[in-house]
A protein has these predicted regions:
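Conserved AMP-binding/adenylate-forming
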Residues: 66, 83-130
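Adenylate-forming
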Residues: 46-49, 73, 77, 96, ...
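Residue-level preference for short coil/turn positions at secondary-structure junctions
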Residues: 54-56, 92, 137
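Short, intrinsically disordered, charge-balanced linker/junction segments flanking boundaries
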Residues: 133-139
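Flexible, non-catalytic linker and terminal segments flanking ANL/adenylate-forming cores
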Residues: 1-40
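Solvent-exposed alpha-helix faces
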Residues: 78-82, 101, 137
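Conserved N-terminal alpha-helix of the aminotransferase class I/II PLP-enzyme fold
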Residues: 59, 72-83
Length: 139
């Protein structure tokens, strides 16, 4: 298998892949399971859903009755992606460690980082320093 060109400026993830002979064989022969040469999961999950079903449908519903539409979610996601790239200077391929409780802002940060081309590394908030250290050192 040959890797297609990447949009990542930071090539850490590609450089850290195991040798090619250890890669799995991926065969996409089913017509319904075809993927484009380049795919951004956040664009597919958020923007394509809006394209298909509209921006005013509920995207996030909370137990307290609060809800965000896809339009509101996308605005927050795009703003977070902009902060990562324009304010913090991150580039596609940089790793972003998320350590948050599950909630709507976790979704915003995860999708925003993906949309900006980052590699998202999520960790559990219950982990202590000794458990986080080896991960943070690699991120």
């Amino acid at each position: 298998m040959t890797l297609s060109p990447s949009a990542h400026v930071d090539t850490f993830t590609r450089d850290a892949l195991p040798p090619a002979h250890l890669w799995p064989t991926l065969e996409f022969t089913i017509p319904d399971v075809q993927y484009p040469e380049r795919l951004n999961a956040a664009v597919e999950l958020l923007d394509r859903t809006i394209d298909r079903f509209g921006a005013d449908r509920p995207a996030i519903l909370l137990a307290d009755g609060t809800s965000w539409s896809y339009r509101e979610l996308r605005a927050r996601v795009d703003q977070f992606a902009q902060v990562l790239t324009e304010d913090l200077g991150l580039v596609p391929g940089n790793r972003v460690l998320l350590r948050m409780l599950n909630g709507p802002w976790t979704v915003v940060c995860w999708l925003g980082a993906l949309k900006a081309g980052m590699v998202v590394v999520t960790t559990m908030v219950a982990w202590r320093a000794r458990e986080l250290r080896p991960i943070a050192e690699r991120v």
